[in-house]
Swiss-Prot record:
Species classification: Eukaryota, Metazoa, Chordata, Craniata, Vertebrata
Organism: Cistugo seabrae
Residues that coordinate or bind a ubiquinone: H201
Additional notes on this entry: Heme 1 (or BL or b562) is low-potential and absorbs at about 562 nm, and heme 2 (or BH or b566) is high-potential and absorbs at about 566 nm.
Gene that this sequence comes from: MT-CYB
Cited PANTHER family: CYTOCHROME B
Self-association state and partner proteins as the record states: The cytochrome bc1 complex contains 11 subunits: 3 respiratory subunits (MT-CYB, CYC1 and UQCRFS1), 2 core proteins (UQCRC1 and UQCRC2) and 6 low-molecular weight proteins (UQCRH/QCR6, UQCRB/QCR7, UQCRQ/QCR8, UQCR10/QCR9, UQCR11/QCR10 and a cleavage product of UQCRFS1). This cytochrome bc1 complex then forms a dimer.
Protein name: Cytochrome b
Keywords, in A-Z order: Electron transport, Heme, Iron, Membrane, Metal-binding, Mitochondrion, Mitochondrion inner membrane, Respiratory chain, Transmembrane, Transmembrane helix, Transport, Ubiquinone
Molecular-function annotations in GO: metal ion binding; ubiquinol-cytochrome-c reductase activity
Consequence when changing T122A: In strain: Isolate 4183
Subcellular localization, as worded in the UniProt entry: Mitochondrion inner membrane
Amino acid sequence: MTNIRKSHPLIKIINNSFIDLPAPSNISSWWNFGSLLGICLGLQIITGLFLAMHYTSDTATAFNSVTHICRDVNYGWILRYLHANGASMFFICLYLHVGRGLYYGSYIYSETWNIGIILLFTVMATAFMGYVLPWGQMSFWGATVITNLLSAIPYIGTELVQWIWGGFSVDKATLTRFFAFHFLLPFIISAMVMVHLLFLHETGSNNPTGIPSNMDMIPFHPYYTIKDILGLLIMLTVLLALVLFSPDLLGDPDNYIPANPLNTPPHIKPEWYFLFAYAILRSIPNKLGGVLALVLSILILAIIPLLHTSKQRSMTFRPMSQCLFWLLTANLLTLTWIGGQPVEQPYIIIGQLASILYFTTILILLPLFSTLENHLLKW
């Protein structure tokens, strides 16, 4: 009799994806972040669902409903802070996952990579709309500033912004539709994750050497399930430490002030995970140029497979490319810092230099150094 795990139409899919899946024997902890992202998504959907049971998407009551969740709902405070800080964990895992893909050449699997980029954009859109829902000062002004960027689009910009707002300013209609989309998008993300995994399992996983590992595979369970559980425990420890000891560490104090269209906060800035893109946006004096740079700062990932000039897939044995990769990492951290600073010298010039360096490193230096390494190795 065949094992039900291998014969049942539904269980068979789970078996081939998570149990009997052949995996390279040498993948490191950098390959943990995919499963951590899945867990983050599940956690966000569950906590979000319970929060939605008590939240009201009306400008008059939204702020008070969040206060009510924290004060009156049983364990509402932990749900709210798990959801808010869970988003931060989500983005930490997301950026590390993308960084891993860049370092080890995972972008060679172009379908998986491209679905991943679409996922990144969708998660960013979801997080942005979620930040608007508590209807604090930073929620309101963040929504106003970021949606207003679309007015830079020639001809249709102004109409497009008013269409998104549902009126002539960010108001009740905007909040209601943002709540609707914020609720809907995670389920669309879940479906896209399945497509992401479908394409990944067509080719199999990459590994740190960048060399095909078809002749040395091991079953995913128990080897990588136990490894993923360790990653999960570490992530949960960090998340719970954040939620229980310092839940507002990554938030903005201005968001504890109810939204007031008549009073602009001194420094409008998004959540920390968008600061690098915000710094790139601010570093260009022209509005349309800034918006284009903002979009391209993420969309540039789509052309990375075309810029791969090295004869080796991974950066493991390419010290010059490694130096550039860590320069890029330091550069992104610099941009994140600049995005949170006021628009004054020396922050303006540092932001402009870091933005130029970001695009130069990816578009010119990485392909150039890869070609140079090929010549040095006489390939």
